[in-house]
Amino acid sequence: MIRQEVLHAVLDPKAVHFKQFWLSSVDRDESELLEVLCFGNYGDLNAIQSCEEWKDAIESKLRTLTLLGLCEVPSELEYDQAMASCCIPDDVILEQRMVELQAQVHFQLDSVGRRIKVLRCLGARDIYNGERPLLLLRDAARSRESTLAGLRQWKQKLQYQLR
């Protein structure tokens, strides 16, 4: 049984962090849903077997979370890449989704060039640190190890540029 506060968070368009719910979850269906919301992407939507009555809300949330994840790294994002990752059918819907992320991401849309220039990403997706076993996902794209590896690469790049 999915807790009411979890459902409210899924339905809240501004909510992007679900790890606190995942860590305290004891229900298998709820844990699977929260695992995908925390660490999965739009492509993992079909892994969730329960929650049919909220499928549209969950699908919408995963699109938003996947876009946020794409904005964490690059300074420029092609429309085609974002649309393919989130299964978004047209430019207008993509631009609407980006506007929904304004509190998390500062960006400029280039509708003609079909690019999103990420100026600053204020939010980030949840990070998996092995707190409990994953039930559905083979591995989490954003884990402690991958975050540390990215920081080490960034440090080396900065050190190289300063030489």
Swiss-Prot record:
Record keywords: Cytoplasm, Nucleus, Signalosome
Keyword Iron among record annotations: no
Gene Ontology biological process terms in this record: cellular response to pheromone; conjugation with cellular fusion; protein deneddylation
Entry's localization field: Cytoplasm; Nucleus
Domain PCI per the UniProt entry, residue ranges: 5-120
Gene Ontology cellular-component annotations: COP9 signalosome; cytoplasm
InterPro entries in UniProt: Csn9_fungi
Major place of residence: cytoplasm
Keyword Cytoplasm (UniProt): yes
UniProt function note: Component of the COP9 signalosome (CSN) complex that acts as a regulator of the ubiquitin (Ubl) conjugation pathway by mediating the deneddylation of the cullin subunit of SCF-type E3 ubiquitin-protein ligase complexes. The complex is involved in the regulation of the mating pheromone response.
Subunit: Component of a COP9 signalosome-like (CSN) complex.
Protein name, UniProt field: COP9 signalosome complex subunit 9
Organism taxonomic ancestry: Eukaryota, Fungi, Dikarya, Ascomycota, Saccharomycotina
Gene that encodes it: CSN9
